[in-house]
Amino acid sequence: MRKSGWGYDFETRERFVNVLAKRATWRVRPYAPSDETEILALCTKIFGSTSTLKEWRWRHLENPVGEALVFVAEERDSGKLIGHAAAVPIDFKVGDFTRKGFFVVDSAVDQVYRGKGISAVLTVAISKESCKRDGGFGCGLPNEQAYFSTLKTGAIRLFTMSLFVRVLDWPGLLRARLRSAFLAKATGGLIRLFQRRKQPRSHPRFIIEEVGRFGSPVDDLWQRSASRFPIAAIRTATTLNWRYFECPGSPYRAFSISTDGNWQGYIVIRRVQKWGLKLGTVVDLFVDPDCAQAGELLLYHADATFRADGVDAVWGLFSAPERYRKLLRDAGFFKIPKLKAVRPFHFVAEFVTVDHLRPDLAARDGALLRQEDQWFLSLGDTDLA
């Protein structure tokens, strides 16, 4: 857990931001509906984003948990939009209570205006507004370029999410990296000999079905299982439908597994084309902790679905208890080690404002929130899938 710099003291940070704002030729303000076109143009310019206005409104305005916090930076004289930050709300179960987190999905400053403190002021604006919303806090998965600057404004690294990969077509994967098709096929066949896994035993009492909408069965599953997850994004039919089925052009497929009419778990998957490969993504996997076989069967079903689609490899991103990690290992996934070429997925959170203004919440939840092994987070809880 990294903690250093001016951003970790509330009053020092406030003085810094106030002085900066008074001297600046720009200002930060809450978003207005007329800003949407400029926000999209800025994100396209900086990130190459292809998001449409419909997608932007779905993510920022239609979330059943609440509207996103959106701030913009503009030139004082011209009104030109030069920066933007947004965070979408997530209801977290934290122990026996509910806390609102605000996951930063966009943070962008025009290259011409970088180094002037705009990003810091936008971040603090989100922090202060988060606290006003039921004692909320900001969080996110900053990329490598933004990670250290995020820490300087008061965030701390809570944990690093684990990247799990399972290769389905070794010859195909190697062919994308090797010029020789013969060598790729031979090497891939040899690797497969050492990576055969045992098919999980099916059981007639388990029924796997594709889900077109989530309903009361997933609410019942969450109510039965929630106590086993100290910290997790609350999973309800309403939020899951918004996340996976109501997004424009939804690319997701979901499958449930049940016994005697009761859901024991679900899995959400999608397929993407990248680096000349067909990649399958385990976006979300949630199972009753007392029914490990349900998780095994869901992963095997996803495996078969991906194979039928010609997928080369499958990946997922989790911060999860050991029982989940074992489930993935048994299904043939391996955890990617720390490598220079692989981006680390550091999950950060900022508690400076809420700890200062709501010491009651800091006393109640602060220690638990900072315990890495108490969190359950999947790729679907982030903005990466």
Kindly give the residue locations of the regions a language model identified.
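Active-site/acyl-donor-binding loops of N-acyltransferases
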Residues: 2-23, 89, 136-195, 243-246, ...
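Secondary-structure boundary elements
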Residues: 78, 128-135
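Short acidic, glycine/Ser/Thr-rich loop/turn "cap" segments at secondary-structure junctions
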Residues: 104-113, 133-138
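A conserved beta-strand-loop-helix scaffold within acyl/acetyltransferase catalytic domains
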Residues: 23-108, 210-287
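Extended, charge-rich helix/loop segments that form flexible
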Residues: 177-221
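Short, surface-exposed acidic/glycine-rich loop or hinge patches that mediate macromolecular interfaces
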Residues: 33-34, 112, 144, 319
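Conserved acetyl-CoA-binding loop-helix of GNAT-fold acetyltransferases
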Residues: 109, 114-128, 292-304
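Active-site-proximal structural scaffolding
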Residues: 49, 66, 119, 131, ...
